[in-house]
A protein has these predicted regions:
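Alpha-helical segments with a strong preference for the paired helices of cellulosomal dockerin domains
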Residues: 258, 572-593
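Non-catalytic C-terminal accessory/binding modules of secreted extracellular proteins
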Residues: 153-154, 163, 170-190, 194-195, ...
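A domain-level signal for the mature, folded cores of soluble proteins
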Residues: 210-225, 310-319, 332, 336-414
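Active-site recognition of the HExxH zinc-binding catalytic motif
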Residues: 323-338, 423
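Acidic carboxylate motifs that coordinate Ca2+ or other divalent cations, activating on Asp/Glu
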Residues: 248-252, 327, 573-575, 579
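N-terminal prosegments of processed precursors
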Residues: 19-129
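Active-site-proximal segments of metallohydrolase catalytic domains
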Residues: 123-134, 177-292
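N-terminal signal peptide c-region/cleavage motif recognized by signal peptidases
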Residues: 15-17
Length: 593
């Protein structure tokens, strides 16, 4: 067995089933130990990630600084001893090291990463897992942990994170605590329509017996973290202050979740290679006489891209956005990651939900300080809403936002129970004030989700996403297919600019920026069809036999109205009936030829 295979096998055998946040893909400014500033970009996800400078040179961020990377003959990435600088400021030594990152070595690195990525991302049912209750006010233990070599930056972390997790309103304690739109509890209160208001008991801070590197590993490209040991050590340090059984919310003898907020930054948002990547892991660990099913973790701090102080230096002491916590906490409730986890599925557009879901890139909306609330599918899975099914032609349906007392609608595939379209109203106010677009948003669901399983990966099959958006403008650009802000590629072949990406999101709802007032088969909008298996067992599509027409949005009230049409043979004008008006439509079509 060669060395690469041995390393891969070791990682996969020791890794716990874990589900994590996407990599933060905006530019990150690092302060180097020599006083210089370096802008970097993070790529990939927990199982395979890398960091680059503006010209694509690979670097490794560590506790001691960010260094030019080396790639060895086994495709492993490691820091050199040479500190990295902006391309125009590089020394001759840096230039030589950058030149050694040849295309064959980069290809080997990504091939190695794809092997680990593929193994780590196979869907799995986590037998015996107990998810948090979806209603009421379950109690959750949150432990604040410092490392032997890193303390908290926030002066009073108990005060700050108790507010961050539980408060109705937020105020600034000098670490931008008020920068978050809502506390975590308030986020779920709003998302659930008042049906779910978790209570977080914050204890600590305690100092772990080992260093950051001991728990976070040292790999610059793969998952080598020890969240199980992190959680065990944290619980043992507070066991005299708490009764673990208080956090068994359904009385089955198992604590559903213990959450750790650790000092410093997280690797998912540009933290050093030794730091933890935000995640929830199924551990099924017995501590004392009580089992804990899941450990979760995220970082204390976040450094927003592009935001600088009055001296021009990046802010480095922002409290973390609630988006990361809400994403990981949602895993502990059973929701899966909805972003694509394979190289093939990242190379295509119209594959996912991007900013339209907390389980995709919506966790980083406004840098994570204004995460996307639960959408119609997520609410229905949690049992917070039962969408009203449309079965016959209905005119003048009024759609209001869920947070304002509205409801969503459902169109079901009579041939396949798990396939539906969901319809809701998104308005740029309240919890959705930071949304990219507004109007009627349509989701295509082809996923047997009557029971939750955080071990699924619904959007990993390129060309057949299971949970996605039907984009009014005909294009939902994948974030993996966008160029970075400096114009360079993310590594998946895409050429969309950041401006095009934002415009694509704004154009997803109806009528949207494109003024699209109908959704019919004739428009050939991606994802507006049903899936079936052809005679060869391959995916094929067929028309839905329904249409949404006369979609209008009242710009003052935000109400959306539309007609639901069950199509009939001869109903050429799609008004829900066959009559002489269809003859006029036919004549118009002929004359237009």
């Amino acid at each position: 067995m060669n060395r690469t295979l041995i390393i891969l096998t070791t990682i996969l055998l020791t890794a716990l089933p874990a589900w994590s946040s996407r990599a933060f893909r905006e530019p990150i400014t690092l302060s180097q130990p020599d006083g210089t500033q370096l802008t970097v970009w993070l790529h990939g996800d927990e199982s395979h990630h890398w960091m680059t400078t503006a010209d694509g040179t690979m670097v490794v961020n560590t506790q001691k600084g960010c260094f030019v990377a080396s790639i060895n003959e086994d495709g492993e990435l490691a820091p050199t001893t040479v500190l990295a600088h902006e391309p125009t400021l590089r020394t001759a030594a840096e230039q030589r090291l950058a030149a050694r990152q040849t295309e064959p070595l980069r290809t080997l690195f990504h091939k190695r990463g794809s092997q680990a990525e593929g193994s780590a991302r196979r869907a799995q049912v986590v037998e015996g897992n107990r998810y948090l209750p979806h209603t009421g006010s379950p109690r959750v233990l949150v432990i604040l942990t410092a490392y032997q070599d890193l303390d908290f930056t926030i002066p009073d972390p108990v005060k700050s994170f108790t507010q961050y997790l539980n408060s109705e309103t937020l105020e600034d304690y000098e670490n931008k605590e008020g920068f978050n739109d809502h506390s975590v509890r308030k986020y779920f209160d709003i998302s659930s329509g008042g049906q779910f208001t978790p209570q977080f008991d914050v204890v600590g801070p305690v100092t772990l017996p080992d260093s950051m590197k001991y728990y976070g590993g040292s790999s610059a490209y793969a998952n080598d973290e020890n969240i199980s040991k992190l959680g065990e050590d944290a619980i043992n340090l507070v066991k005299d202050k708490i009764d673990l059984k208080d956090y068994d919310n359904d009385g089955d003898g198992r604590v559903e979740l213990v959450y750790i907020i650790h000092a410093g930054y997280g690797q998912n948002a540009g933290g050093p290679a030794e730091s933890m990547w935000a995640k929830v892991a199924y551990v099924n660990r017995k501590i004392g006489d009580t089992y804990v099913n899941n450990f979760g973790c995220n970082a204390e701090l976040f450094s927003p891209s592009g935001l600088k102080d009055d001296k021009g230096f990046p802010y480095a002491k922002y409290i973390n956005g609630t988006g990361t916590f809400c994403h990981e906490f949602s895993h502990a409730m059973g929701l899966p990651d909805l972003y694509p986890n394979t190289t093939a599925s990242r190379r295509v557009d119209n594959q996912t939900l991007e900013h339209w879901s907390i389980m995709d890139y919506g966790l980083y909306r406004r840098n994570g300080f204004a995460p996307t609330p639960y959408n119609a599918w997520e609410r229905s899975v949690m049992g917070w809403e039962q969408p009203k099914e449309l079965t016959e032609t209905t005119k003048g349906i009024t759609l209001l936002p869920f947070a304002e007392g509205g409801k969503s609608y459902k169109i079901a595939n009579s041939k396949k129970s798990e396939e539906v379209f969901l319809i809701e109203n998104i308005q740029k106010r309240g919890v959705n004030a930071r949304a990219f677009g507004h109007g009627m948003l349509v989701y295509h669901i082809d996923y047997a989700s009557n029971t939750v399983n955080m071990g699924d990966y619904p959007n990993n099959t390129a060309g057949h996403p299971r949970v996605t958006v039907v984009p009014a403008d005909g294009l939902l650009i994948s974030g993996y297919q966008t160029l970075r802000s400096d114009g360079s590629s993310q590594g998946y072949g895409g050429t969309h600019t950041q401006a095009e990406y934002s415009a694509s999101l704004a154009g997803d709802p109806f009528p949207g920026t494109g003024g699209i007032t109908s959704l019919t088969a004739d428009q050939q909008i991606p994802s507006f069809y049903y899936y079936y298996k052809d005679d060869n067992g391959k995916d094929a599509t067929e028309q839905t036999g329904v249409a949404l027409t006369n979609i209008t949005e009242n710009t003052e009230t935000g109400a959306v109205t539309f007609d639901y049409i069950v199509e009939q043979l001869g109903d050429l004008n799609r008004d829900g009936k066959v009559d002489t008006a269809d003859i006029t439509t036919l004549v118009d079509l002929i004359l237009a030829q």
